[in-house]
Curated annotation (Swiss-Prot):
This is Monocarboxylate transporter 13. It is a multi-pass membrane protein. It is found in: Golgi apparatus membrane; Cell membrane. One of its GO terms (molecular function) is symporter activity. The lineage of its organism: Eukaryota, Metazoa, Chordata, Craniata, Vertebrata. The keyword Protein transport does not apply. The keyword Cell membrane applies. GO terms for cellular component: cytosol; Golgi apparatus; Golgi membrane; plasma membrane.
Amino acid sequence: MVRRAEPPDGGWGWMVVLSAFFQSALVFGVLRSFGVFFVEFVAAFEEQAARVSWIASIGIAVQQFGSPIGSALSTKLGPRPVVMTGGILAALGMLLASFATSLTHLYLSIGLLSGSGWALTFTPTMACLSRYFSQRRSLAMGLALTGVGISSFAFAPLFQWLINNYAWRGALLLVSALSLHLMACGALLRPLSLTEDAAVGGPGAQITSLLRHGPFLRYTAALTLINTGFFIPYVHLVAHLQDLGWDPLPAAFLLSVAAVSDLVGRVASGWLGDAVPGPVARLLMLWTTLTGVSLALFPVAQASSTLVVLAVAYGFTSGALTPVAFSVLPELVGTGRIYCGMGLVQMIESIGGLLGAPLSGYLRDVTGNYTASFVVAGAFLLAGSGVLLTLPHFFSCISVSTSRPQDLVIEASDTKIPLPKEEGLGEN
């Protein structure tokens, strides 16, 4: 395979964008709409909210904690077979969940099996996309991740309609059929070889260098805090609205309102990330702060109009932070280490995904409402914003990628691994 000196910034990369669009829809669109099933599981198994919340949390955590496996396999085999295998596992998990007779079955089928499929699907696709773009990376990420917004808008009322007509078991069977389309997404991922790949060494050397890289560790800590509160509305907003007296279908529709705003936010932020001078991390900090504030204000709102405004605000800002979050990482670790870097980030931030929803459910069980749940979720995002302030060149007027001097080459396991001088190993 011929090595390219630079990412092509187009060409087949747009087909990778298309693949990532549908892949993100079929992974996080399903996860974000899972609050509709949450109410059904509580009623069907007569369990507390905290225990039912573990279904989505295990799925999110397994998807993220297993990401290094998907990354390592993609480094060896290429992303195509890995993603196609992930599609099979995701569909199989939903299929088995439709026959569940206890929460344990749902933990294993949706949480473990489908989560494993998502781990082999999401990270390799997004890492592959990062390698195809440089100057237009944020825009490409924004367009690809609009799949989450569009599917969240469509899936929440669709899933509620399916539940009303086929019960939750029949609805899960149809979600399984949808998940099989991840195989087609994987078939579109053509491997790309870059000259930087020859200099970064094997996966072991890459992981060792990343774990000693101060800016990478701080960025990972920030995303872990953000991830803890990020998914709370998509798990508990429907239940919160029903506590306020809303009917299930209008409550699910409010998730769709947030999803439309999310869609606009992803495209707008993707364009701004490439167009506005300065480090992309600064834009990420802005969107994260606004998302945290909107989350904390949800319990204050009582009127329907106010809740709609907050849903629009949360949808836009939470959608806007996603593409720039993926754009910051290649600036810190380089495209040659993007598979390992993205997999490692996803694994570590899975701690937040694992604890977020159960913590929210626990606070609901203790206090009797979701006020503390949303306030604490917002606080986690604001804490993540504070950590982002410590990244290199945050207060610079130029981007990280254009401010780097000549790379410093560091020996690790007899392999030369370049890292930027001002971001050297061991920096704290």
